């Protein structure tokens, strides 16, 4: 894959870069695996904003993606690779030998016609899913479960992957892309390979409107607000805020650690790398 840089025929097109995607299917998605989505625009059941900067955007159907890979030892053939507006990775429509079709997160290197399978002792081949205890140390994987049978939770975004670095007893040790080292049960399933669309981080939307198409609204700086709206607000003329960066509710931000889950602290061997 390669990046396409738009010709600057207008101000909005001047900085646009996108990923060339000839291998993606150009038709409609598989209708039986679609669901309607209702937008909450960041509001809760009382109508209050609980997540800022959300609203609007293009209507989208949700693609039902199989994160559990629970059709054991039934071979499947990849019919096509598709774009999914709900995630950064591409998805693959696979046809199982028993006639069922499912969407899965497409790994890099998977193409139409490829054969994949999920099973206890599946081959170490891109797209195959099997428990971590049966995967060789050093293998690069994605779509890793956090609990056996719960479905993939780690490394699902475009271009992400996890390396299996050790197996000891009932636990496997994983090295995340962030640098974090953590243990998960060796019975958790993972898929071989890294996630597709690894050039996604090089894409430039080019204009504010492209964010609006995605349902993302503008982010106003705290120093541009009034004191009633933000701790950084107010002041005569332009100010720096006068204090260390905080959220609108006074909680320190920009590097402030908010993790509070003592139950799983023991599973983290090394915290993620910080700048």
UniProtKB/Swiss-Prot annotation:
It holds the Pfam family Ribosomal_L2. InterPro entries: NA-bd_OB-fold, Rib_uL2_dom2, Ribosomal_uL2, Ribosomal_uL2_bac/org-type, Ribosomal_uL2_C, Ribosomal_uL2_CS, Ribosomal_uL2_dom3, Ribosomal_uL2_RNA-bd_dom. Belongs to the universal ribosomal protein uL2 family. Part of the 50S ribosomal subunit. Forms a bridge to the 30S subunit in the 70S ribosome. One of the primary rRNA binding proteins. Required for association of the 30S and 50S subunits to form the 70S ribosome, for tRNA binding and peptide bond formation. It has been suggested to have peptidyltransferase activity; this is somewhat controversial. Makes several contacts with the 16S rRNA in the 70S ribosome. This is Large ribosomal subunit protein uL2. Residues 39-49 have a biased composition (Polar residues). Keywords: Ribonucleoprotein, Ribosomal protein, RNA-binding, rRNA-binding. GO terms for cellular component: large ribosomal subunit. GO terms for biological process: cytoplasmic translation. Residues 35-55, 223-260 are annotated as: Disordered. One of its GO terms (molecular function) is rRNA binding.
């Amino acid at each position: 894959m390669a990046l396409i840089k738009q010709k600057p025929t207008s101000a909005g097109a001047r900085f646009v870069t996108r990923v060339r995607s000839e291998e993606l299917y150009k038709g409609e998605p598989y209708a039986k695996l679609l669901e309607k989505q209702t937008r909450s625009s960041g509001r809760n059941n009382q109508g209050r904003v609980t997540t800022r900067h959300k609203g609007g955007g293009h209507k989208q159907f949700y693609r039902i993606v199989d994160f559990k890979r629970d059709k054991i030892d039934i071979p499947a053939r990849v019919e096509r690779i598709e774009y999914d507006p709900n995630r950064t990775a591409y998805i693959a429509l696979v046809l199982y030998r028993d006639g069922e079709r499912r969407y899965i997160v497409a790994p890099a290197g998977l193409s139409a016609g490829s054969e994949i399978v999920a099973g206890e002792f599946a081959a170490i081949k891109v797209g195959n899913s099997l428990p971590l205890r049966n995967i060789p140390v050093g293998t690069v994987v994605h779509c890793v479960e956090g609990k056996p049978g719960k479905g993939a939770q780690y490394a699902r975004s475009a271009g992400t992957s996890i390396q299996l670095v050790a197996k000891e007893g009932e636990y496997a040790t994983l090295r995340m892309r962030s640098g974090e080292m953590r243990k998960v049960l060796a019975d958790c399933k993972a898929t071989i390979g890294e996630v597709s669309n690894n050039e996604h981080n090089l894409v430039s939307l080019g204009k504010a409107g492209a964010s609006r198409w995605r349902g993302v609204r503008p982010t106003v700086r705290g120093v541009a607000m009034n004191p009633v709206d933000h701790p950084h607000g107010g002041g005569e003329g332009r100010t720096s805020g006068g204090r260390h960066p905080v959220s609108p509710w006074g909680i320190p931000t920009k590097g402030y650690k908010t993790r509070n889950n003592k139950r799983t602290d023991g599973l983290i061997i090394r915290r993620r790398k910080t700048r």
